[in-house]
């Protein structure tokens, strides 16, 4: 996230904590331009619910050459950080539930978190109706049966991502086919 999304992130966190009071969370926040005040706000919020916030500051060169496309001018380059979770998070974390910082959680997320991943890359919400009519699979050149998905909620198998170099695959695809990327990180994933 960046400073502009701290307020939204706080709402997401409160909805997560309030609707999952029996769970203990470590929230991993990836941010480049958060002030100490911003961090203190989110850390205090997590602490109020007996949870923990950890912060990761990616290298600025990680997104060198990346741009925000289409009509998504409300997004920042920070949107691409989810592609690099396997590189940014500590090696001892083998799975992560990625949540966009502008969503509201209305119930128990435990069933989603406990979804077996086995050898799968992860779990995502398919049939993104906002992009359905665009036939993204044709433009991105992947089989239609693989389904385009919304990248706002992702349960990610970090072991698989690390073993299969998913972060590097995203970079390689972006640099090889930049003209195909319209929906930013979502197209890469």
Regions found by a protein language model. Name each.
Residues 124-131, 146-189:
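Catalytic core and acceptor-binding pocket of nucleotide-sugar-dependent glycosyltransferases
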């Amino acid at each position: 996230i960046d400073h502009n999304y701290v307020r939204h992130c706080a709402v997401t966190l409160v909805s997560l904590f309030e609707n999952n009071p029996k769970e203990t969370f470590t929230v991993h926040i990836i941010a480049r331009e958060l002030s100490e005040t911003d961090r203190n706000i989110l850390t205090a919020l997590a602490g109020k619910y007996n949870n923990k916030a950890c912060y990761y500051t990616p290298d600025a060169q990680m997104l060198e050459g990346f741009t925000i496309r289409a009509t998504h001018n409300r997004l920042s380059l920070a949107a691409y950080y989810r592609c690099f979770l396997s590189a940014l998070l500590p090696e001892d974390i083998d799975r992560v539930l990625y949540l966009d910082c502008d969503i509201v959680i209305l119930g128990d997320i435990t069933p989603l978190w406990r979804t077996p991943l086995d050898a799968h890359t992860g779990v995502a919400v398919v049939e993104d109706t906002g992009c359905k009519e665009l036939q993204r699979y044709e433009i991105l050149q992947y089989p239609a049966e693989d389904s385009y998905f919304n990248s706002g909620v992702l349960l990610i198998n970090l072991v698989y991502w690390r073993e299969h170099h998913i972060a590097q695959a995203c970079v390689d695809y972006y640099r090889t086919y930049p003209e195909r990327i319209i929906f930013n990180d979502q197209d890469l994933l």
